[in-house]
Amino acid sequence: MYRAVTRDIEVTVEPNFLPERSSVEKQQYFWSYTIVITNSGRETVQLRTRHWIITDATGRRQEIRGEGVVGEQPVLGPGERFEYTSGVPLPTASGFMTGRYQMVSEGGEKFEIDVPTFSLDSPEAKRVLN
């Protein structure tokens, strides 16, 4: 599990390789990832946008920006949490993702929170120790 905290908002990520949706022969690898966003602060906030940077094992970067997550722009009061699962394909057996969410407070202040960088590893990925 990966974890980041920004302004009392915790984001945890748990990636999961899906062999049944992957094919070594076709160089298609697929992961799901479950994200939990927990508001430990004192004010209500809303997730407005997402910005992902996805990097495969060859260093190829892909940036994705969009409204909300999984079609929602959740509002989180103090102590509330939002959980969702999404997925990502890669042409390589490993890679990583990182990102940010734009939030807005009850008072209208916009700010960004970090999504922790997380590793996408399949059983086919060659391990390299530095």
Task: Describe the residue ranges of each PLM region.
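Short glycine/serine/proline-enriched coil/turn segments at secondary-structure junctions
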Residues: 23, 43-44, 91-95
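Intrinsically disordered, low-complexity Pro/Gly/Ser/Thr-rich segments with frequent PxxP/GP/PP motifs
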Residues: 62-94
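Low-complexity, acidic Ser/Thr/Pro/Gly-rich terminal tails and inter-domain linkers that flank the onset
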Residues: 1-27
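Short, solvent-exposed loop/turn segments enriched in Ser/Thr/Gly
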Residues: 28-34, 97
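Asparagine-centered strand-capping/turn motif at beta-strand->loop junctions
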Residues: 37-41
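Terminal connector regions
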Residues: 89-130
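Detector for glycine-centered tight turns/loop "hinges" at secondary-structure junctions
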Residues: 8, 42, 59, 108-110
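Short acidic, flexible loop segments centered on an aromatic residue
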Residues: 43-62, 103
